Regions:
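N-terminal signal peptide c-region/cleavage motif recognized by signal peptidases
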Residues: 19-21
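Metalloprotease/metallohydrolase-associated module, dominated by Zn2+-dependent proteases
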Residues: 27-108, 152-195
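Active-site recognition of the HExxH zinc-binding catalytic motif
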Residues: 123-135
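Bacterial N-terminal signal peptides that target proteins for export
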Residues: 1-12
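Post-HEXXH active-site segment of zinc metalloproteases
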Residues: 108-119, 135-166
Length: 195
């Protein structure tokens, strides 16, 4: 039933976009991995390295084992008819940068630490993928909101409306990322806990 409702909502959105002359947007995802290196032979050495080298959350000032930064970019074209400005096409670019640990001397680590690390890294990737999916959703929501923009009297008005929608979507999705981290205890409830 949920799938049917989603399909109907998407069909209505597409239908509305086509009736207003807005071409469906292309949404591009660019995913970048930024690895930071850690060394150690056992769990406690690795934990010390994670605690001292992990990426810092700019909002809280705390270090975490991994972090996903994201941003939205957009390009658009508009047309004028009878002195009114209307969006004719747009594209959205979602950039997600995942800051992630790399155990560089894993082959010299003790076997238990290696096994625990592999499970941990798998679960940490899964948690960060959740952030990437939220960022993709933000791109889709921005696209939908831009497709629903009406006509404006000036070029400045349409550009301000686009900027306002982007800021609104970014603010809402930033809160969703914070809620995701709160609900998962920054991935710990998903098994992203070491040791």
């Amino acid at each position: 039933m949920k799938g049917l409702a989603l399909c109907l909502r998407q069909a209505v959105t597409i239908g509305c976009c086509l009736s207003f002359g807005v071409v469906a947007a292309e949404i591009e995802l660019k995913r970048k991995w930024e690895l930071y290196e850690i060394n150690g032979r056992n769990q406690s050495e690795l934990r010390r390295e994670l605690n001292s080298k992990g990426p810092v959350n700019p909002d809280s000032g705390k270090r975490f084992d991994a972090r996903t930064d994201w941003k939205l970019g957009w390009e658009y074209k508009y047309e004028t008819k009878q002195g009114r400005y209307r969006l004719s096409s747009h594209s959205i670019k979602v950039t997600a940068t995942i800051h992630f640990p790399k155990w560089v001397n894993m082959e010299t680590g003790n076997p238990l630490a290696q096994r625990l690390w592999l499970v941990y890294i798998h679960n940490l990737k899964r948690h960060e993928q959740g952030h990437v999916e939220l960022a993709q959703r933000a791109g889709q929501v921005l696209s939908d909101r831009l497709s629903q923009l009406g006509a404006f009297g000036t070029r400045i008005e349409i550009e301000e409306a686009i900027k306002k929608k982007a800021q609104e979507v970014t603010r809402i999705h930033k809160a969703l990322h914070q809620d995701y981290d709160r609900r998962t205890n920054h991935g710990k409830s998903q098994g992203a806990r070491f040791p």
